[in-house]
Amino acid sequence: FMAAIVLIENAMPTSGKLYVIPFANASTLTHTDYMEGTPRHFTVETAGGPRRFRYGSRATSPADQWPDPDIYVHASSGQKLSGSETRNLNRAYPGRPDGTFTEKVAYAITSLIRAEKIDITVDLHEASPEYPVVNAIVAHERAMKIASIALLNLEFDDITMGLEPSPVKLRGLSHRELGDATGTLALLMETTNPAQGRLRGVTNEALIVEGKDAMYVAAQKLGRLFVPFGEEGQPLKTRVARHVAALQAVFDAYTSDSPDKQLVVGAMPS
C-alpha cells in the first residue's frame, strides 16, 4: 500500500479522475498472519522524520470473519479452493452484498467501479521472490494492449517487467472478475517482497524496509528464484518506485490509446 500512499500525497491529476484506495480491506491491517512472526509495524525514515506504518496481513482478520469453511466456494463461479481463501479479497471478486465480510468488501469495490464508470483499474500487490508471477503485470484480455504498451515504455527506462494474461479459469481475482463484471480495463501489478517468502531468514522491520536476506541470496545462486536477488536485496523504496513507474507508464499508455479520455497525472515521484 506504500505506492498508494505516495500517490495520495503527491499525485495531481490534470486531466481525468484518479481514485486511490490505500487499504482495499481495512480489516487486514488489524492483525498479522499467525505463526509467521511478522512485526505489527515498520518505520520509514523521511526528510520530515520517521513515519510508522502497520504491516498487516493479506487476509481479513478472523475477528471480522470466522470460522473458515473446510472448502471455500467462489460464489459466482462455484470454483472450490482451500477454506482459508474465504478471507482473501483477491479470491472474492466480484463479491456479493449479502455474503461474507470479504465478499462485501469485494462487492463495494466492484460497485464503486460500476457507479463511477472507472475506465482502468490497477490492483497493486507484492509477492515472494520464489513466486513465478513477480515483477509483472497481469492483464485482463481487454487490457492487454495497454499493458503491452506500458511494458515497452518501461523497458526504454531499463525497468523490466513481465506480462501475464489473466487466467480465465482461476476465479475471484481482481484482474479477471473486475474485467468481466464491469467495463474497466483490469490490471494487477506484482513487485517482490522477501518478507512474504517461504525461504526468508529473520523476519523483522529491517527485512520489510531494507529487503536484504542472506537466505534469498543463497536461493538466487541455486536458481530457485524468479527475480534477481543480490546483496543489495529488494528494498521497499525500490519496490514502491517500480509500482509508481509502472503506474505512470499505464497512465501514459491509456492516454495515447484513448485520445478522447485523457488520464494525465502530474507530480508523480520519479
Question: Model regions: which residues?
Answer:
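C-terminal accessory segments enriched in acidic
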Residues: 101-108, 112-120, 124, 129-270
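Active-site/substrate-binding loop(s) of hydrolase catalytic cores
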Residues: 1-152
